[in-house]
Amino acid sequence: MEAKLKWIIPAVVVVLALVATLDSAGAAPNDRVARGKYLVMVGGCNDCHTPLKMGPNGPEPDLARMLSGHPESLAMPAPPKLGEGPWGVAVAATLTAWSGPWGVSFPANLTPDPETGLGKWTEKEFIDTLRTGRHLGRGRQILPPMPWFNYGKMTEEDLKSVFAYLRSIPAIKNKVPQPIPPDAG
């Protein structure tokens, strides 16, 4: 019996060590989606990519349009001129339009809608976008207030989890406007 324990204990230790070193690439898809949901929530993605609506206690996320970006139906007037001084940014009440020295930017539709969201994006394009700060990893610059430079430091597995979660939510058709460049004059 004692001889068997000499072999069983090291075998169990080896198996546990192997299991502990596995990354979550082999994790079940539901585990990846759950991790992605957690990262989206703590990362504050809803703060800008989900429009606000007025609720009984003031502004609250419009979960019927969760992560669909700036509402297509909400035409924005020209942003106010802020002039010189420490105030350099104007924000729409929905938190889905931002104006500053870069011009006007609108948070993107992160839902899996194939026409207006991330539905046709590959996992690689999503990761490249967050790593490079360029649309689809090669296009136009991602503008403030999107903190791509912070999210781009996430692990590959975390970014894959975020993408998996975004692919799992309901697709919402919502064409977000293109950014508006700053005034030339």
Model-derived segments and spans:
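The canonical Cys-X-X-Cys-His
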Residues: 36, 42-52, 126, 162, ...
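Bacterial N-terminal signal peptides that target proteins for export
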Residues: 1-12
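Surface-exposed patches in mature extracellular/periplasmic domains of secreted proteins
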Residues: 47-51, 138-143, 173-180
